[in-house]
A protein has these predicted regions:
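C-terminal substrate-binding subdomain of Rossmann-fold SDR/epimerase-dehydratase oxidoreductases
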Residues: 1-115
């Protein structure tokens, strides 16, 4: 079955859960001077690129229906995914790139669901 998406042209960011936990852990030991920090990979991309790559990695690129649905109207900007304040506070924390994180997740799902 095809997964239906809008045009998926908005920026987006994915972070592997281990990197997220590392960032939160480090923040717990720091005196912070900001009201909030964006925790992300530091490498945001257009959502369409992520969706196509996931399709390729699971062997179903033809099932990624980009542009099948209307745009949902949600608009993000690249600057919303800026993690430089966090990196300057706790140092580099993201160590698992998108492909490696998605592959780890795919393998976990296969083992968990016995696919």
């Amino acid at each position: 079955k095809e997964a239906a998406f809008g045009p998926a042209l908005q920026p987006y960011d994915f972070i592997y859960v281990d990197d997220l936990i590392e960032a939160v852990y480090r923040l717990g030991f720091k005196e912070t001077n900001k009201p909030f920090y964006y925790i992300g990979s530091g490498n945001p991309k257009v959502l369409k690129d992520y969706l196509i790559r996931i399709g390729e990695l699971v062997g179903c690129a033809d099932k990624v229906g980009i542009g099948v649905r209307e745009d949902d109207g949600v608009k993000y900007t690249m600057d919303m995914f800026d993690n430089s304040n966090l990196v300057s506070t706790i140092g580099e924390y993201a160590s698992i790139d998108f492909d490696k994180g998605i592959n780890k997740t795919i393998n976990w799902l296969k083992n968990s669901l016995m696919l």
